[in-house]
Amino acid sequence: MARVKRGVIARRRHKKILKLAKGYYGARSRVFRVAKQAVIKAGQYAYRDRRQRKRQFRALWIARINAGDRQNGLSYSRLIAGLKKATIEIDRKVLSDLAVNEKAAFAAIVEKAKAVLA
């Protein structure tokens, strides 16, 4: 049986992991065994946080909208109910941007929601 030489494959695999671990602290960027664990953990965090990012942004948008509509004398839930009744289809991302940067336009939208609710 012929001798199997696999140094090239092992080197390639190690280099790939160490390249992914570049910039990590201490042994996590230098020692293959530790680097491999660090890269796997980083991947798990990245996967989890890609999903959490969507939740966090939605929560941020809702907080901004809530702050803006309370300045105009309406709660968040009442505003959303009013917008649905008035068939104004603006998503929360755009609403929050208006609440922060275009206060007059946001106030006009809140007034329309108030008018439908009254």
UniProtKB/Swiss-Prot annotation:
This is Large ribosomal subunit protein bL20. It comes from Azotobacter vinelandii. Keywords: Ribonucleoprotein, Ribosomal protein, RNA-binding, rRNA-binding. Belongs to the bacterial ribosomal protein bL20 family. HAMAP family: Ribosomal_bL20 (MF_00382). One of its GO terms (molecular function) is structural constituent of ribosome. GO terms for biological process: ribosomal large subunit assembly; translation. The gene is rplT. The keyword rRNA processing does not apply. One of its GO terms (cellular component) is ribonucleoprotein complex. The lineage of its organism: Bacteria, Pseudomonadati, Pseudomonadota, Gammaproteobacteria, Pseudomonadales. It comes from the Bacteria. The keyword Secreted does not apply. NCBIfam families: rplT_bact. InterPro entries: Ribosomal_bL20, RIBOSOMAL_L20_CS, Ribosomal_protein_bL20_C. Pfam families: Ribosomal_L20 (PF00453). Disulfide bonds: none annotated. Binds directly to 23S ribosomal RNA and is necessary for the in vitro assembly process of the 50S ribosomal subunit. It is not involved in the protein synthesizing functions of that subunit.
